[in-house]
Amino acid sequence: MARALTTDESHIHKTLGAKVGLEEVEAVERIAIVVKDTRYSVESPVAYRIKGTDSILIFGDLGSPVNLHQLKRMYEDSIRSSKDQEGPGLYDEIHSDPQEDGVKEAEEITVDPSDERLSEEDIKLISSQVKASRNDIIKALVESEYDVVDAMMKLTK
């Protein structure tokens, strides 16, 4: 099991488990729910398959909502403005010499430069919304399998 169930979750599990068979879905890393134009991430998900059906019971904390239309508009605006001007994003504001800030050098992220999943537009979009270093943005993108919304949510925690 990925994590222990809370008291309320355990009660629901026992109640439903007695009536229908529940089979844990192993190695669940992320669950997202899209309701109309809003995407929610389920934090620390635990999922069970209800035997004899195609249904899944999900336990976890509902993350902050993300308006997909608004995010798409911001992304398109970011691409348009980056084509118009090559101004710095938030990650460009960070000093090139980390000793100036008294900050240790961040761990370098090794990413294949020919990997088409990593785009400069995604990095610029995230940097316009979240104050983070370029390396942190790339690391969040890689860890979230290049999902911009998930990467932004990881960086805002």
UniProtKB/Swiss-Prot annotation:
Q: Start and end of every UBA domain? A: 118-157
- Identify the CDD domains for this entry: UBA_NAC_like
One GO CC annotation: nucleus
The organism sits in which domain of life? Eukaryota
One Gene Ontology term of the biological-process aspect is: protein transport
Compartments, as annotated in UniProt: Cytoplasm; Nucleus
The residue ranges flagged as biased composition, category Basic and acidic residues, are 81-107
In terms of InterPro entries, this protein maps to: Nas_poly-pep-assoc_cplx_dom (IPR002715)
What the protein does comes down to: May be involved in mitochondrial protein import by enhancing productive ribosome interactions with the outer mitochondrial membrane and blocks the inappropriate interaction of ribosomes translating non-secretory nascent polypeptides with translocation sites in the membrane of the endoplasmic reticulum. EGD2 may also be involved in transcription regulation.
**UniProt family annotation:** Belongs to the NAC-alpha family.
Can you say what this protein is called? Nascent polypeptide-associated complex subunit alpha
Organism whose genome encodes this protein: Encephalitozoon cuniculi (strain GB-M1) (Microsporidian parasite)
Q: Which gene encodes it?
A: EGD2
